[in-house]
Amino acid sequence: MNRNGVITCALGGLLLSQAATHQAMAADLSVQVNQFFQQQYPDKESQVKVVIKTPQNQWPQCDMPEITLPANARPWGNISLSVRCDGVRRFIQTQVQVSGHYAVAARQLAAGEKMTLQDIKMKQGRLDTLPPGALLEPNFAQGAVSLRQINAGQPLTRNMLRRLWIIKAGQDVQVLALGEGFNVNSNGKAMNNAAIQDNVRVRMASGQIVSGTVADDGTVHILL
């Protein structure tokens, strides 16, 4: 083989090596981005799929990229993800598809109706296609009043509902401390407004401040 042939083979081998390295780093980045979003949803019932929309030849290349979500970024949908490699920050465009549970109306509700737990049903489906403010658990809706007509099966959102304070700041409340095989009743004064299933802080007669959950009957439950 002449000298030119040797140089051509060497250059070809170098280009193949660089291409293989780039593909390996790209594959690693894809895996790391998917793992990053999986960690945002520790619930085992949530399923996450990430599609990187930025062309692969524009992906940052390094062994240990620092991946972060921009401030106030949505948890799913189209997200511009910050990736820092060797001190240089770049943004890659991703589409995050998340499937999990969300709350829907179990029946048709008229405007002004107070919702009970029986009016709420949990459904499995794509979360990233839901309207803004969709409820992923029933607590917010329980005891709230519908601001407009809600159809059966319609996803519940925060702007559809007005929560009713069952406890108001300064109100005397009954506190029920629940332990294994026993419970203790006492009284205190609420330090904040709270609806059913909300967390409320209570100042006890001794001056001690405790936190508990508001039950349907307005008592504050503390698990010991």
Swiss-Prot record:
UniProt protein name: Flagella basal body P-ring formation protein FlgA
PANTHER family in the cross-refs: FLAGELLA BASAL BODY P-RING FORMATION PROTEIN FLGA
Similarity comment: family membership: Belongs to the FlgA family.
The organism of origin for this protein: Yersinia enterocolitica
Residues spanning the signal sequence: 1-26
Function: Involved in the assembly process of the P-ring formation. It may associate with FlgF on the rod constituting a structure essential for the P-ring assembly or may act as a modulator protein for the P-ring assembly.
Compartments, record wording: Periplasm
InterPro entries, per the entry: Flag_basal_body_FlgA_C (IPR017585), Flagellar_FlgA (IPR039246), FlgA_N (IPR041231), SAF (IPR013974)
Gene that this polypeptide is encoded by: flgA
Pfam families found in the cross-reference section: ChapFlgA (PF13144), ChapFlgA_N (PF17656)
One GO biological process term: bacterial-type flagellum assembly
Keywords, sorted A to Z: Bacterial flagellum biogenesis, Periplasm, Signal
Primary localization class, coarse: periplasm
A cellular-component GO term for this protein: periplasmic space
